[in-house]
């Protein structure tokens, strides 16, 4: 079977981990394949994980071994379609075509990747272009015309890229060497060479680039050799700019210390270790890129607005190349470009990150504003398809329930936003179709879709029948989920369904095993009955509550009943020592004593309490301030590293501080 054919349904295993009644998509990698069918096994993997660059590279290497040139170009084409701004992929492709000595293919690729809408900007890609120009224009045989062509190419690369790239030493070295190797045949040519060299040195020595000291020494020596009488004048004119550039480079170097920018430029260099992988990016690297971009925006070089934007755009392009699977990098880039470019950048971003919610939602907003409803629907469907496939793979391969739950909620969230968006742009009927499709996933979605749909139905029609039916249907899958029951109760309280509130409470309390969730449900119903029922029912509910939770503080439950707009004012106003410094209730034991102390309440020798006046807070030590400065921002952590509530509970219950002597 050729690489372009799609296997029919008969080639899929009849029994697989993915086929157990789930409505999630079937996994292509579970198709029956000959173990030796490397080509189609790789294509199945690509279909299942279409942004895994390594798989494409392995397939290309397979075709290289088979000398299947057309297939190699086809796979490279797929890569460029998915990752049009990944300059290193264009460089790998160009270097392979150069090895085949295919000038026509090389020129076509160069025109495609260095101009127009897909214009890349990377020093290694431009260096490949320069190498090709020099190969085609031999200055020994081509003379002045060939030299002129090469000089134009160097000037182009300098203006487009090298002046923005701090790590561009090789370019400047090659350019200077090319000019130094020029052997003038007349005084006019010699004068031209000197002027071009001086102009180049002036440009270089005003830029924050690496090895600047070396170039400065080389420049001063060159000026002395050209003309000792004028050397001091030219060197003096450039000295201040050089000192500033050197200082700025050192500042940039310190700021970006630890930044990794190593990507392969040839096919045989590409490995799993040096290729970007979907779902994997280093938050620390992301933080450094963000700092670099901000440093450029601060305009330390005092550039005109137009040049500044070009420079910042260059850094953004570098960032999205090295962090192409980090949605934040793409979002920031999309918000930086001109308004008419937002949609185009986001389109490219979601090709690299088809399952990114933030990028999908932002692109959907622009599509909605431009009335591109069909494209909007396709975007949501592509995002949901990608997340669904990732969830199916997780179901088959991981034993971590937290990862599966996270992915399930991600899929549900995508459906929720898709549903509400369709309600906004086309109406209730389209939104109901989305909900109908989503609920077929049964346990592969989380409860939020039922809650979201219920509120949508209610606010659209002010009718409680349909939303209550929706929430009742959700009980089929989430009757033991305390969070769902809590949300269900919130809705019933909103729409004043007293009988259903009591019925739901009585039917669920024996099915919920999470005691924290069950406690919240009890408190919610007690609070409701306290405000809208009668006191006898409140006392009966409290009796049942304390039978279930005998360790609970009675004053805690009592004050909870008198909450006003969700705030426990009774505790805050009359029992502030029962709350910690952040306003979080503290229940019992040593935690209460600590809270009394933090609230400024101490006990005298007779046991009576008195409030201390808090004097000025002690100054924070400088060591702590310095530590806080270098800590990464909280948004760079995908999960909660330390739960403060659990830590507080642990310290309260398990740690005993010995009394002072």
Curated annotation (Swiss-Prot):
Keyword tags: Cytoplasm, mRNA processing, Nucleus, Repeat
Pfam families assigned: Suf (PF05843)
Subcellular location: Nucleus; Cytoplasm
Signal peptide bounds: none
Any Gene Ontology CC annotation: mitochondrion
HAT repeats mapped onto the chain: 67-99, 101-135, 149-181, 192-225, 262-298, 307-339, 513-548
GO molecular function, one term: mRNA binding
Biased composition (Low complexity): 14-23
Biological-process GO terms, alphabetical: mRNA 3'-end processing; response to DNA damage checkpoint signaling; RNA 3'-end processing
Primary location group: nucleus
Ranges for region Disordered: 1-37
Stored SMART domains: HAT
PANTHER family, per the entry: CLEAVAGE STIMULATION FACTOR SUBUNIT 3, RNA CLEAVAGE STIMULATION FACTOR
Its job: Component of the cleavage factor IA (CFIA) complex, which is involved in the endonucleolytic cleavage during polyadenylation-dependent pre-mRNA 3'-end formation.
The name this protein goes by in its record: mRNA 3'-end-processing protein RNA14
Lineage: Eukaryota, Fungi, Dikarya, Ascomycota, Saccharomycotina
Name of the gene encoding the protein in the UniProt record: RNA14
């Amino acid at each position: 079977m050729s690489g372009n054919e799609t296997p029919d349904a008969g080639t899929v295993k009849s029994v697989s981990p993915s086929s157990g009644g789930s409505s999630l998509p079937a996994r292509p990698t579970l198709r029956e394949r000959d173990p030796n069918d490397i080509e189609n096994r790789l294509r199945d993997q690509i279909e299942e994980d279409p942004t895994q660059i390594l798989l494409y590279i392995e397939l290309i290497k397979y075709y290289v071994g088979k000398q299947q040139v057309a297939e190699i170009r086809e796979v490279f084409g797929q890569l460029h379609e998915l990752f049009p701004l990944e300059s290193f992929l264009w460089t790998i492709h160009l270097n392979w075509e150069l090895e085949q000595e295919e000038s026509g293919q090389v020129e076509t690729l160069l025109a495609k990747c260095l101009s127009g809408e897909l214009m890349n900007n990377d020093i290694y890609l431009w260096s490949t272009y320069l190498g090709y120009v020099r190969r085609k224009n031999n200055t020994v045989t081509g003379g002045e015309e060939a030299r002129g062509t090469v000089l134009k190419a160097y000037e182009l690369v300098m203006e487009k890229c090298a002046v923005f790239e701090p790590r561009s030493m090789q370019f400047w070295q090659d350019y200077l060497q090319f000019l130094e190797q020029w052997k003038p045949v007349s005084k006019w040519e010699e004068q031209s060479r000197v002027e071009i060299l001086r102009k180049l040195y002036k440009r270089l020595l005003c830029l924050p680039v690496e090895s600047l000291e070396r170039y400065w020494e080389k420049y001063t020596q060159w000026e002395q050799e050209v003309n000792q009488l004028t050397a001091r004048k030219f060197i003096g004119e450039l000295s201040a700019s050089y000192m500033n550039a050197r200082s700025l480079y050192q500042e940039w170097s310190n700021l970006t210390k630890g930044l990794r920018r190593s990507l392969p430029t040839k096919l045989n260099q590409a490995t799993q270790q040096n290729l970007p992988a979907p779902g994997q990016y280093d938050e620390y690297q992301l933080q450094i890129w963000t700092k670099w971009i901000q440093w450029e925006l601060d305009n330390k070089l005092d550039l005109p607005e137009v040049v500044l934007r070009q420079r910042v755009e260059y850094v953004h392009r570098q960032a999205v190349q090295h962090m192409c699977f980090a949605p934040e990098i793409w979002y920031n880039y999309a918000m930086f470009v001109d308004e008419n470019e937002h949609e185009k950048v986001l389109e490219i971003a979601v090709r690299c990150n088809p399952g990114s919610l933030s990028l999908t939602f932002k692109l959907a907003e622009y599509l909605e504003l431009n009335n591109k409803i069909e494209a909007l629907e396709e975007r949501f469907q592509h995002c949901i398809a990608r997340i669904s496939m990732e969830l199916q793979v997780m179901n088959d391969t991981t034993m971590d329930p937290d990862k599966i739950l996270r992915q399930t909620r991600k899929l549900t969230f995508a459906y929720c936003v898709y549903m509400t968006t369709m309600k906004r742009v086309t109406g209730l009927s389209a939104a109901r179709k989305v909900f109908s499709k989503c609920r077929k996933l049964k346990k592969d979605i989380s409860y939020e879709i039922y809650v979201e749909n219920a509120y949508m139905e209610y606010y659209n029609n002010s009718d409680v029948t349909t939303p209550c039916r929706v929430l009742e249907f959700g009980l089929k899958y989430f009757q033991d989920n305390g969070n769902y029951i809590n949300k269900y109760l919130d809705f019933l309280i909103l729409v004043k369904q007293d009988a259903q509130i009591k019925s739901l409470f009585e039917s669920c309390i024996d099915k919920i095993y999470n005691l924290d969730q069950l406690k919240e449900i009890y408190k919610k119903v007690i609070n409701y009955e306290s405000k809208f029922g009668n006191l006898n029912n409140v006392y009966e509910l409290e009796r049942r509550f304390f039978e279930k939770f005998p360790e609970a503080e009675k004053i805690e439950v009592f004050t909870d009943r008198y909450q006003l707009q969700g705030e426990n004012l009774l505790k805050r106003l009359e029992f502030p020592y029962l709350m910690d410094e952040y306003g979080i209730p503290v229940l019992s034991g040593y935690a209460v004593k600590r809270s009394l102390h933090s609230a400024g309440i101490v006990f005298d020798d007779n046991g009576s309490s008195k409030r201390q006046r808090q004097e000025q807070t002690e100054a924070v030590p400088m060591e702590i301030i310095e530590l806080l400065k270098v800590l990464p921002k909280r948004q760079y952590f995908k999960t909660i590293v330390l739960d403060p509530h659990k830590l507080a509970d642990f310290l309260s219950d398990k740690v005993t501080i010995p009394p002072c002597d």
